[in-house]
C-alpha cells in the first residue's frame, strides 16, 4: 500500500509521467528513463536508478512511490495455469491468471473489484460490485506477473525483447467490465503497448466487453486494440436474461458498434464469446440464429464450456452438443474454437474468478478457498 501523501508512479502512462516530471521541473526524457526503470527493470525504489540525477532521485523519494499489488495467495494448477489473488483493500480481492501455452503466454487481467453487469453464468457478478481498480492496480497485475514469471524461469529484468518476455498476450477478461472503468483501463493498456514499458502489439492486447456500445466507439477512436464481445445469446429476449446489459444496448445496436469498430481495429474480425449452457442457448437452431444475427460482422466464435457454480442454476452443455453446435458454425464458413478449460482446479477457469466464496469481503476465507497453496514452480 502507498502513502496517501505520495503519488504512485504506476498510475501514469507515458503522457502522464511526462506531465508529472514537468511539475518537478524535469525534462520529458526523464519520464522515459523512469518508465523503463519501473516497467522494464522492475525497480522498487529510486536509489538504484543510476542514470537519474541524484537531485531528481531525492525529489522522487519525498513525493512518489512505486506501489505494487499486495498478493494474498499464489496458486499453480496441475495444468500450469497460475493464479494470483490480490488484496485491493477494504476486504476486496481481484484475481490475475496466467495461462501458459507452447507458443505464447496469456495473462488475464481484472479491471474491477466485482462486477455490476451481473451476467447470469458468471460467478464474479454474483459477488456484487465494489469499486473500479486504478491504473496502478491494473498495470500492476502485468508488472507483478511478468517479473514473478521471469524469476521462476531464472530470467533477469530488462528490456522486453521477445527472448526475455514471458507474458506475450494480455486479455482484459478478468473480473469486471473494462469499459465501465474506461479512464483507468485505457492508460493501463497504453503502458502495455508502450515500447518503453511492455511493448506489446495492439493485436496482442484484447479487451473483452459485454457490449457497452458508447465506450466501444470511444475505444475505437482512442486506442483500438483487439476486441472480444461476450455475446452468449442469438436473440434479444434470451440475451436480456443472460446479459442484462442487453436491455440497454440490444443486439442490433451492438452489431452496428462492432461494424464501426472493425474500421479501425488491429484485427479484421471480432471474437464473439459464447458460453455453452445446457438447454438454454446450445441447440443447432440457436447456432443458425447466431449466424443470422452476426452475418454482417466479420467474426470468429469462441465457444466456452460453462464452469458451474451453485448460485447459477445452470448446467454445462454436453460435449457432443457443443460439437454439434460448433459444426453448424463451421459448416457456414465461420472460424470456431472451443475453449479448453484451464485452471479449474484452482477456480481460475473462465467465469470462476469469484472463487468458492459468495461474500467478496471474506478475503481470509477466500484466500484458501481454492485449495492448498502450493510452492510456485517454473512453468
UniProtKB/Swiss-Prot annotation:
Keyword 4Fe-4S listed: yes
Chain ranges of the Radical SAM core domain: 101-345
Catalytic site: 95 (proton acceptor), 350 (s-methylcysteine intermediate)
Any one GO MF annotation of this record: tRNA binding
Record's keyword terms, sorted: 4Fe-4S, Cytoplasm, Disulfide bond, Iron, Iron-sulfur, Metal-binding, Methyltransferase, rRNA processing, S-adenosyl-L-methionine, Transferase, tRNA processing
E.C. number(s) listed in UniProt: 2.1.1.192
Record bears the keyword Phosphoprotein: no
One term under GO cellular component: cytoplasm
Protein name: Dual-specificity RNA methyltransferase RlmN
Protein species of origin: Burkholderia lata (strain ATCC 17760 / DSM 23089 / LMG 22485 / NCIMB 9086 / R18194 / 383)
Amino acid at each position: 500500500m502507498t502513502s496517501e501523501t505520495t503519488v504512485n508512479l504506476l498510475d501514469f502512462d507515458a503522457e502522464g509521467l511526462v506531465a508529472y516530471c514537468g511539475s518537478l521541473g524535469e525534462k520529458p526524457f526523464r519520464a522515459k528513463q523512469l518508465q523503463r526503470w519501473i516497467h522494464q527493470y522492475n525497480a522498487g525504489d529510486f536509489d538504484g536508478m543510476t542514470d537519474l540525477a541524484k537531485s531528481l532521485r531525492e525529489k522522487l523519494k519525498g513525493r512518489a512511490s512505486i506501489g505494487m499489488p499486495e498478493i494474498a495467495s499464489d496458486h499453480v494448477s496441475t495444468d500450469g495455469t497460475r493464479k494470483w489473488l490480490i488484496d485491493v483493500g477494504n476486504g476486496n480481492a481481484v484475481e490475475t491468471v496466467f495461462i501458459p501455452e507452447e507458443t505464447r503466454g496469456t495473462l488475464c487481467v481484472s479491471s474491477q473489484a466485482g462486477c455490476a453487469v451481473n451476467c447470469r453464468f458468471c460467478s464474479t457478478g454474483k459477488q456484487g460490485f465494489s469499486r473500479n481498480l486504478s491504473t496502478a492496480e491494473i498495470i500492476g497485475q502485468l508488472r507483478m506477473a511478468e517479473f514473478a514469471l521471469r524469476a521462476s524461469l531464472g530470467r533477469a529484468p530488462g528490456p522486453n525483447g521477445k527472448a526475455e518476455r514471458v507474458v506475450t498476450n494480455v486479455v482484459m477478461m478478468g473480473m469486471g467490465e473494462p469499459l465501465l472503468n474506461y479512464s483507468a483501463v485505457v492508460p493501463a493498456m497504453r503502458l502495455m503497448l508502450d515500447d518503453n514499458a511492455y511493448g506489446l502489439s495492439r493485436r496482442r492486447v484484447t479487451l473483452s466487453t459485454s457490449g457497452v456500445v458508447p465506450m466501444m466507439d470511444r475505444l475505437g477512436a482512442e486506442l483500438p486494440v483487439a476486441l472480444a464481445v461476450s455475446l452468449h445469446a442469438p436473440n434479444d429476449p434470451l440475451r436480456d436474461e443472460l446479459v442484462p446489459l442487453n436491455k440497454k444496448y440490444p443486439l442490433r445496436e451492438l452489431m452496428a458498434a462492432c461494424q464501426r469498430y472493425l474500421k479501425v481495429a488491429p484485427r479484421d474480425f471480432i471474437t464473439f464469446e459464447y458460453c455453452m449452457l445446457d438447454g438454454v442457448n446450445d441447440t443447432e437452431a440457436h447456432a443458425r440464429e447466431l449466424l443470422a444475427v452476426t452475418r454482417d460482422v466479420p467474426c470468429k466464435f469462441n465457444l466456452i464450456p460453462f464452469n458451474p457454480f451453485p448460485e447459477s442454476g445452470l448446467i454445462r452443455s454436453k460435449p457432443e452438443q457443443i460439437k454439434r453446435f460448433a459444426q453448424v458454425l463451421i459448416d457456414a464458413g465461420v472460424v470456431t474454437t472451443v475453449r479448453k478449460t484451464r485452471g479449474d482446479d484452482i477456480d481460475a477457469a473462465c467465469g470462476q474468478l469469484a472463487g468458492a466464496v459468495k461474500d467478496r469481503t471474506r478475503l481470509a476465507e477466500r484466500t484458501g478457498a481454492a485449495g492448498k497453496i502450493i510452492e510456485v514452480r517454473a512453468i
